[in-house]
């Protein structure tokens, strides 16, 4: 009987300990993991003279190779800027525009447009200069991997609203984590565009409400939509990303409270979306960029024509296997062992109870037979014989 009790106790202890391990798994720490701190680096990509407004609408264009800010690293935050030589910001309020800058990684093939692009598009910015923060303010351990031999390529458009040329410095601010970076998940950038794989420009309409819808892109893998960076132009009032026709990201572009150098308000921030849900093979992703130029004035060229507009979402997707169902998002690979051990423990426990009850029932019968030959010898026996 004592042996039976020990066996039951052992099984119950194992079941309880395994149950605790399953629910505390997300809190367990690997002592071999190294806590990684983000490093920061500001990079200057040259000083350029931007022509006056009456020359090609004040546009300056640049395409060139540039070095990455780090190698064998994970980039977590990216932002671009335009400055004067004294370090002050050159923006719409003082008549200078970072019209566009787009970074390509020439070491990787673009996942949507392939060879139609010079590399994988992983970061873009307009004059709103919204940072691409893959950590979502430090909430996520997410980054973009840069290999040892990766090379960047940039495509830049600067615009001058003044009628005299302006000298400006093109810069970018990077945050990154160097090896080892095992704490970070790696995102793959996917560029969704209303213009598909052509130029991102699409025609604007004055004093009208209109929208552009991108062709759906069908995915062929499992993953998580970890971060969505959105880009539109002046006149936009709504930007939506859909998966299989259902909205998974909806943002309202924000405008400055003060007029720019041209006397109208301009975009100041286009919010991103994070943790927009899972994707699976066969899912289709598209976006809709909605404009209202009756409320927000579009950009106008020097000859009175409208500048084209855009609708872009750069989505970082963490690729992986099919999701496993769980009741709280934790790791439940202990569920089957728990169920098996619990079943065994309950079976043994029930057997022990049945065995004890039977012994207690049979004891008085045996004792009465014993009394024919000798008297009751212990207090327990005397009690059971009553």
Swiss-Prot record:
The keyword Membrane applies. GO terms for molecular function: oxidoreductase activity. Its main location: membrane. It is found in: Membrane. Glycans are attached at residue 86. The chain crosses the membrane at residues 334-354. It comes from the Eukaryota. GO terms for cellular component: membrane. Residues 1-22 form the signal peptide. The keyword Transmembrane applies. Pathway: Secondary metabolite biosynthesis. Its EC number is 1.-.-.-. Keywords: Copper, Glycoprotein, Membrane, Oxidoreductase, Signal, Transmembrane, Transmembrane helix. It is a single-pass membrane protein. It is an enzyme of class 1 (oxidoreductase). Probable copper-dependent oxygenase; part of the gene cluster that mediates the biosynthesis of squalestatin S1 (SQS1, also known as zaragozic acid A), a heavily oxidized fungal polyketide that offers potent cholesterol lowering activity by targeting squalene synthase (SS). SQS1 is composed of a 2,8-dioxobicyclic[3.2.1]octane-3,4,5-tricarboxyclic acid core that is connected to two lipophilic polyketide arms. Belongs to the clz3 oxygenase family. This is Probable copper-dependent oxygenase M1. It comes from Phoma sp. (strain ATCC 20986 / MF5453). The gene is M1.
